[in-house]
């Protein structure tokens, strides 16, 4: 088995987390139709947890098909707000509407990671975190979206907790890493047990 991994994600924050943890990896972005997969799963009544897990597996499987002997890490994150999955905002107005809907309320982020090797899944984990958004004013939310659009357009829920988005919240119950989109503690434990990283 290889001593490095392929990250089947173009996420800068996931790459940064792995790099800072000293993991030897390279990026090989998976080209999958996430919207089609998500729509089909929602139509079948799949849970948000299962949707996150299936999307992460689809990415790992896709890249593993090209590099079967490599260890491939696929990841995905979904946001469950009152039974509805929120996606990355399509424009500033949608970002603002998402934030206004969530203020003063609780939502859940589910971060899935799946490792594939030899065309089969070896490990998987779905971490979850519950967040409560503060009652921010319309004026603040409008200026927040305007200031941060280039960054938050790539984030489910239209915020990044590692940036100014931290000001939007009153409570976070769960791992900060799951908010960032990668269950790092569980992943590091698995990679250590497999001899991929030193323990």
Curated annotation (Swiss-Prot):
GO CC aspect terms: cytoplasm
InterPro entries: ITPase-like_fam, Maf-like
Compartments in which it is found: Cytoplasm
Membrane-crossing segments per the record: none
Catalytic activity: a ribonucleoside 5'-triphosphate + H2O = a ribonucleoside 5'-phosphate + diphosphate + H(+); a 2'-deoxyribonucleoside 5'-triphosphate + H2O = a 2'-deoxyribonucleoside 5'-phosphate + diphosphate + H(+)
Cofactor(s) it depends on: a divalent metal cation
Enzyme class: hydrolase
Major localization class: cytoplasm
Biological processes per GO annotation: nucleotide metabolic process
UniProt xrefs under Gene3D superfamilies: 3.90.950.10
Entry keywords, A to Z: Cytoplasm, Hydrolase, Nucleotide metabolism
Catalytic residue positions: 76 (proton acceptor)
HAMAP family: Maf
Family statement drawn from the similarity comment of this UniProt entry: Belongs to the Maf family.
Protein name per its UniProtKB record: Nucleoside triphosphate pyrophosphatase
Organism the protein comes from: Ruegeria sp. (strain TM1040)
């Amino acid at each position: 088995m290889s001593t490095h991994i392929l990250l089947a994600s173009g996420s800068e924050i996931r790459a940064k987390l792995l790099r800072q943890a000293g993991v030897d990896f390279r990026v090989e972005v998976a080209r999958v139709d996430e919207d089609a997969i998500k729509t089909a799963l929602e139509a079948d009544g799949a849970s948000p947890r299962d949707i996150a897990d299936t999307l992460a597996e689809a990415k790992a499987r896709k890249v593993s098909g090209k590099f079967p002997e490599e260890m491939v890490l696929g990841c995905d994150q979904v946001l469950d707000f009152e039974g509805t999955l929120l996606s990355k905002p399509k424009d500033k107005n949608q970002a603002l509407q998402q934030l206004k809907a969530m203020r003063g309320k609780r939502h859940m982020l589910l971060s899935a990671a799946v490792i594939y090797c030899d065309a089969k899944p070896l490990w998987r984990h779905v971490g979850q975190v519950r967040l409560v958004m503060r009652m921010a004013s319309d004026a603040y939310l409008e200026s927040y979206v305007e200031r941060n659009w280039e960054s938050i357009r790539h984030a489910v829920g239209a915020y990044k907790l590692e940036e100014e988005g931290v000001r939007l919240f009153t409570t976070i119950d769960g791992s900060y890493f799951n908010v960032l989109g990668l269950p790092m503690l569980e992943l590091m434990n698995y990679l250590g047990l497999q001899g991929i990283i030193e323990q």
